[in-house]
A protein has these predicted regions:
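Helix-turn-helix
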Residues: 6, 10, 14-56
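Short amphipathic alpha-helical interaction/hinge segments
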Residues: 57, 61-65, 96, 113, ...
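Helix-loop "lid/cap" segments that line or gate small-molecule binding pockets
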Residues: 86-94, 102-111, 188-192
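Hydrophobic/aromatic-rich alpha-helical bundle segments in the mid-to-C-terminal region
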Residues: 117, 121, 135-186
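Amphipathic alpha-helical packing segments from all-alpha helical-bundle domains
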Residues: 94, 100, 106, 113-140, ...
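Hydrophobic alpha-helical connector segments
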Residues: 52, 66-99, 150-156
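Hydrophobic/aromatic residues within well-ordered alpha-helical segments
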Residues: 46, 53, 57-61, 81, ...
Length: 194
């Protein structure tokens, strides 16, 4: 791991635990094992580190989870839909970088406009638009009954978002949260899929 990557890793851990304002550049440098002035060889300052973290997490999420622009292959069956959706949710809930990033975003969404936008996109708008496209594709293939794909996306994603937030607050409930999400997903499929 390069020094630049070590800085990001340390900063993410500290920002997630202490918040952006509760973390000083000296804390980050200390964890990395460098002097604070050496950190400025890699980043202009704490805000530059924060922006690099968000950019990195966005790229990771795009590749591993998808987005409105990158929905992946439209599932061809109920079981494929459940499998792919649970894999995405498992990644979101369990990936340490995404989890820490989410904790940072939740804390800082009221103090930083960019973070507010990213949080809304990942927890509401973007995920709903992504699943609306997937559901619409499955409607077009006759797998999902004809209905409003946007409303179905809300119905599908809202419980998952709430359970992920619960697992972040209460990690000991992660298994229970995943079971609930899968139960809800199977119910959704039973109601809306052929």
């Amino acid at each position: 791991m390069s020094t630049k990557e070590k800085i990001l890793d340390a900063a993410l851990t500290l920002f997630a635990a202490n918040g952006y304002d509760g973390t000083r550049v000296e804390h980050i440098a200390n964890i990395v094992g460098i002097k604070a002035p050496s950190l400025y060889k890699h980043y202009k300052g704490k805000e530059d580190i924060l922006n690099a973290l968000i950019d990195s997490a966005e790229e990771r999420y795009e590749v591993m989870f998808g987005s409105e622009k990158n929905i992946g292959k439209v599932p061809e069956s109920r079981e494929e839909f459940i499998k792919v959706t649970m894999e995405r949710i498992s990644f979101t809930m369990r990936d340490p970088i995404i989890r820490k990033t989410r904790m940072l975003l939740v804390q800082e969404q009221f103090r930083n406009e960019r973070i507010s936008e990213v949080t809304t996109r990942h927890q509401l708008d973007g995920i709903q638009r992504m699943f609306a496209k997937i559901i619409k594709g499955m409607m077009d293939e006759g797998i999902v009954v004809k209905d409003d794909p946007k409303l179905l996306a809300v119905e599908l994603t809202a419980p998952a978002v709430l359970q992920i937030a619960r697992a972040d607050r209460q990690p000991q409930c992660e298994k229970e949260c995943m079971e609930y999400i899968e139960k809800h997903l199977r119910h959704f499929c039973k109601v809306y899929m052929r």
